[in-house]
């Protein structure tokens, strides 16, 4: 057992803090910007850790516009569209490396694509193509929602 009892809370808060600090930096301070790479790494702290650690507290509400997830972002989603299932699919996509960064204009990353598969099957059960800004909003809102439950 760890002597660090508030790991989950601190990890989520610190991950949110990392994003806030990065957003406040000027491009000149950063040299090359890797904000999307940083954000995808931060998804571990904003989505994966909360989903894994306090799974029973993940909302089972229907996924709706209040979460900034539009229907046209979702290409495949088998079963009921709940926040709990949506987050589980994103967690699986990240954990199993089924994630792609894509561009609409070939000069910058504009979207993140996630796929999730049922074990042993070749066809995805979930596919999402979401604009980076919408994913950031969702991840922050999800992390803050989960913090309120800890």
Locations of the language-model features?
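Short amphipathic alpha-helical segments
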Residues: 35, 82-86, 134
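Amphipathic alpha-helical segments that form well-ordered structural scaffolds
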Residues: 42, 86, 90-93, 138-141, ...
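Long, hydrophobic, amphipathic alpha-helical segments used as structural scaffolds
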Residues: 51-58, 98, 102-105, 150
């Amino acid at each position: 057992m760890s002597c660090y009892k508030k790991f989950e809370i601190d990890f989520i808060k610190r991950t949110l803090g990392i994003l806030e600090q990065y957003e406040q930096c000027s491009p000149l301070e950063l040299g090359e910007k890797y904000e999307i790479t940083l954000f995808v790494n931060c998804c571990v702290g904003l989505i994966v850790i909360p989903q894994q650690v306090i799974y029973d507290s993940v909302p089972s509400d229907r996924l709706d516009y209040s979460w900034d997830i539009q229907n046209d972002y979702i290409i495949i989603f088998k079963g009921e569209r709940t926040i709990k299932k949506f987050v589980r699919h994103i967690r699986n996509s990240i954990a199993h490396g089924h994630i792609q960064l894509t561009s609409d204009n070939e000069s910058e990353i504009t979207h993140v694509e996630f796929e999730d598969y049922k074990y042993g099957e070749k066809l995805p059960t979930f596919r999402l193509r979401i604009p980076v800004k919408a994913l950031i909003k969702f991840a922050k809102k999800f992390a803050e929602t989960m913090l309120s439950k800890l």
